[in-house]
């Protein structure tokens, strides 16, 4: 018996469905145009950092001292790490007490659990003072 010849079906790859025009692809990095036809640049995604706050604290404590970009990056990572640890611990504490809201009490307890000894005492004292100052502020 002779082998059967396979029939080739017409390929639909690369063809748009009937009645629809092919969609235009936007290339990355290209400028887009507004309704009036003028070109506008894409804005970069903003990265939030604690750099300005770290710099302000540095100038309060050591007015004549500067900080390098690399050191600022390390300090920013440090603040993010501590923030993440405190937030996670406070979330666990709220879950244990079956509450859906993290209050200053959970934050204070989380700080006491995470930070060692004297550092925890100073942090809770400064935090309590900051909350009191915020509470007395009038709009």
UniProtKB/Swiss-Prot annotation:
Location of cross-link Glycyl lysine isopeptide (Lys-Gly) (interchain with G-Cter in SUMO): 8-9, 25-26
A GO MF term: protein heterodimerization activity
Location(s) in or outside the cell: Nucleus; Chromosome
Record SMART domains: H2B (SM00427)
Annotated Basic and acidic residues bias: 1-10
Function of the molecule: Core component of nucleosome. Nucleosomes wrap and compact DNA into chromatin, limiting DNA accessibility to the cellular machineries which require DNA as a template. Histones thereby play a central role in transcription regulation, DNA repair, DNA replication and chromosomal stability. DNA accessibility is regulated via a complex set of post-translational modifications of histones, also called histone code, and nucleosome remodeling.
Identification of the protein by name: Histone H2B
